């Protein structure tokens, strides 16, 4: 009996100890939950009933100098899944099945995104850049699937397609590597849209606005109970270019319709260096990167041509360079403009025969320039010497970059005896003759030739070209002026030299090879060129500057058509169309242009 009582007391004591331990564990757990981890569990509870739908701010717009929005924003919709909704596999599979056709995604991809949202407990973006057509069907599906929501945003839009595409560039989704490099205070998220090329890339920080977001209170089924906070976005700053809309479009259309559809056209203001037009063909349509995600866009699979021939293509300037040869001879005093030189169609230099493109007979300075007589310039160059020609080359900065703020600009190649001497190679009379007509090792970009035309038009001011005039903040209204005139160098030729060059180039337009740009009411000065190409058809050049009759030149341009053969026939019509567009002499009907679209605040479409 005593043994039994002792055994019973021991068991009772053990049970009491176990109960005490269990009670202590429970008490500690309660302390842990209610005190030590109170904030963590509170945040978890808040997360279960609060969801955030991010709203991407509209990018700043890009305008031409005459106020046309060439990069703007269009309405679009984003589609979210709120993780507070139902989470059972059958429901999620059916949801993916019904959504996939409207999102132009596979069921597996939709399900993967939904499951990711369930796992993270955050609102998950299923699709963006949706068109109005898809949103109508998705709005109906919201009635059957609590927890899926549409939100109205904007997407990038290029109303004029490939207009100045090599300058404006395009946007695309950033990858993880790019995201890690970005300033996170700017509000970037993985897959945010950023500038990938051109102005879109260069001015990314200015064009990108500050994103907003809608903080929602949702119930256990994912239905919206209330909007806790609506943080409005702020649009990015607007960029204003120096481009003239009609002029740029005339350049692009001309290149597109040319013999080969390949080339470049550049126009500058010879009074400031502002870029009035800069076109490279073939161009590309940046809309292929920002099309509606639910619409078929077969162009997206095509590789775009980002090569900017205007600043990256280098070619011999051909007969447009005869202006340099003429200037050198005039400066050196070896040229009597009244002296006539006979052109029998060829020029003998020792055992070599250098041909002219025609038989011109006796020609003086003005006829030699206007008829682009090679023999005339062979004689003048042999008397003047290559060193004098090279000196004038350097005055106009040949062989150097123009200084424009564009990536990948080529400097071209300066051609002359000094350069040869540096390379410890000989210079021959044949080199001088080739140099005199812009052939041989001399290479230039179309932009360089436009800069040269502007320098002659301004009587020696070699300007740094610029294409952005100002940036205007949509948040503060402040204007940041970027367009500043910068004279890189002064081509200090004698005033009489410039007078004679003007007269010869005017004679070329009125009576010579540049007659295609003779336009009533304008004083046009021009020069044609046909660059020899040992690998195929020759290239066509046209260089000109012009002003209203009796006024100083207000535009200088260079047109280049790759494989276009004759400069007059291939590049001349484009130059004429550009001048007519710039001076609006053809008096076109007022173009219907897009409004300076002010983006409406985003809206959330709920099923509550």
Label each residue range with its predicted role.
Residues 1-293, 314, 339, 387-397, ...:
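Periplasmic/cell-envelope proteins involved in peptidoglycan metabolism and beta-lactam response
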Residues 71, 218-228, 263-319, 324-563, ...:
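Beta-lactam-recognizing serine transpeptidase/beta-lactamase-like catalytic domain environment
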């Amino acid at each position: 009996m005593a043994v039994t009582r002792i055994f019973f007391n021991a068991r009772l004591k053990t049970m009491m100890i176990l109960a005490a331990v269990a009670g202590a564990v429970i008490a500690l757990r309660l302390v842990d939950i209610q005190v030590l981890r109170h904030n963590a569990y509170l945040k978890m509870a808040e997360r279960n009933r609060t969801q955030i739908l991010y709203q991407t701010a509209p990018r700043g717009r890009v305008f031409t100098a005459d106020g046309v929005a060439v990069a703007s924003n269009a309405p679009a919709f984003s589609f979210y899944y709120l993780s507070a909704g139902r989470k059972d596999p059958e429901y999620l599979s059916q949801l993916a099945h019904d959504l996939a056709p409207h999102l132009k995604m596979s069921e597996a991809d939709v399900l993967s995104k939904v499951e990711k949202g369930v796992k993270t407990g955050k609102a998950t973006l299923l699709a963006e850049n949706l068109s109005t057509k898809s949103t109508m069907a998705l709005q109906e599906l919201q009635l059957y699937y609590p927890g899926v929501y549409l939100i109205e945003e904007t997407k990038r839009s290029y109303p004029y397609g490939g207009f100045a595409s090599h300058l404006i560039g395009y946007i695309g989704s950033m990858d993880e590597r790019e995201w890690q490099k970005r300033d996170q205070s700017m509000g970037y998220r993985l897959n945010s849209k950023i500038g990938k090329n051109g102005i879109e890339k260069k001015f990314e920080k200015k064009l990108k606005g500050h994103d907003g977001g809608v903080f929602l209170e949702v119930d256990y089924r994912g239905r919206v109970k209330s909007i806790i906070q609506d943080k409005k976005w702020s649009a990015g700053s607007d960029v204003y270019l120096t481009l003239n809309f009609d002029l740029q479009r005339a350049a692009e259309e001309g290149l597109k319709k040319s013999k080969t559809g390949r080339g470049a056209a550049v126009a500058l203001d010879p009074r400031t260096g502002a870029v009035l037009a800069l076109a490279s063909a073939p161009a590309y349509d940046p809309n292929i990167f920002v099309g509606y995600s639910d619409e078929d866009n077969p162009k997206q699979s095509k590789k775009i041509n980002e090569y900017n021939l205007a600043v990256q293509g280098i070619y011999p300037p051909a007969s447009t360079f005869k202006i340099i040869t003429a200037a050198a001879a005039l400066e050196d005093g070896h040229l009597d403009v009244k002296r006539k030189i006979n052109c029998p169609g060829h020029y003998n230099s020792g055992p070599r025969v250098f041909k002219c493109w025609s038989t011109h007979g006796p020609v003086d300075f003005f006829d030699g320039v206007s008829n682009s007589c090679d023999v005339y310039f062979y004689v003048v160059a042999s008397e003047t010497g290559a060193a004098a020609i090279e000196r004038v080359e350097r005055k106009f900065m040949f062989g150097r970059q123009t200084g424009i703020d564009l990536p990948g600009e080529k400097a071209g190649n300066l051609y002359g005896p000094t350069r040869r001497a540096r390379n410890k190679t000989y210079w021959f009379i044949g080199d001088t003759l080739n140099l005199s007509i812009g052939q041989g090792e001399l290479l230039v970009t179309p932009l360089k030739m436009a800069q040269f035309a502007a320098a002659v038009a301004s009587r020696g001011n070699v300007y740094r070209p610029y294409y952005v005039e100002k940036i205007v903040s949509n948040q503060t209204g402040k204007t940041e002026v970027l367009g500043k005139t910068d004279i890189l160098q002064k081509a200090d030729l004698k005033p009489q030299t410039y007078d004679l060059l003007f007269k010869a180039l005017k004679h070329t337009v009125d009576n010579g090879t540049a007659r295609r740009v003779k336009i009533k009411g304008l004083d046009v000065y021009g020069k044609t060129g046909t660059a020899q190409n040992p690998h195929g058809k020759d290239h066509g050049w046209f260089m000109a500057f012009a002003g209203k009759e009796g006024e100083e030149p207000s535009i200088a341009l260079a047109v280049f058509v790759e494989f276009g053969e004759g400069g007059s026939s291939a590049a001349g019509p484009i130059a004429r169309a550009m001048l007519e567009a710039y001076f609006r002499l053809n008096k076109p009907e007022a173009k219907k242009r897009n409004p300076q679209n002010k983006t409406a605040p985003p809206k959330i479409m709920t099923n509550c």
